[in-house]
Every structure is written in structure tokens, then in C-alpha cells.
């Protein structure tokens, strides 16, 4: 394979390529060697699969998504607690179930503002670095919403949902077997 531009900048970096799609059968194996998972997937089934796998494997998830002129970034680590001992939420605490197909347009159908991809991606990378280095204020327990047309950012406080089917008090999701692949 061709040399990576990243290796040219830092020859000490170890790059691992996975030439496969993430699926229920391989999700836990794919993320097992990593401390943090950065999800920038463009479809709901993958987002939910990655969230569920990260929860089951006790991995921190830094999520980012965009559509049209809006973006969202959040850090999920429901296996950890905040300063007062309350567990952090997972993705399903905010978005319980994937929406029915066709309820929301895809990025290909609706389009995305190219510059917003860079902005949201840079914020996601910053959150990953903050988590790895243990610096700054984590976005765990928050949803950062970026509205490009109004040049506005909002931080929305989110809490663990005791009724969450994954991390709640009586979870019904205990593995990835419900995913169709």
C-alpha cells in the first residue's frame, strides 16, 4: 500500500488500517484495542451500533455529525461518573432509537456545507485529544450544537436517562445480536 502522509510527518506513528465495514459481528473486535472511538459516520444504524459497542466495551466515544448547515459533537463515557458521582449519558440517552428510514434525509440527499465538515471535524479531534491528554473541560454530559447559518454554538446539558435501553437502570440491550448485518 502507498505510504501515508501522516507517516511522512511523524515516522514514529503506527497506522492500522481496517479494510472492512463495521458490523455487529466485528464491532467489539474493531474497537477493543483503542481507548477512544471517534465516530463521524453518516447514517443512524452505524451511529447506534458504534455507541452500543463502545458502551459494552467500556470505551469513550466522541461523536460528530453534520447535516446541511448544522453539526453536533458530544463525548460519551457512560462507564464513568461526573464530579458528583452521576453516570454520564450515552448516545441512546439523547436519541433513544434510530429513526425510521426516510424520516430524515441523508447527507447525499440534503447536502452539507463543506466548511462545516472541517469545523466539526476539528472540534471532534480536539475533544479526542482533550480526553487522551486529560486536559480541558470534557464534553461528556453535553451536546455541542453548531448552527453555521447563524454562526452560533450552543452547549446543551444532557443527563443519563434511567429508562435508557442500553445504560439505564433496567437495560434491555445486553449485546449486539439485535443488529441486522
What are these regions (language model features)?
Residues 1-181:
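Adenine nucleotide-associated cytosolic modules
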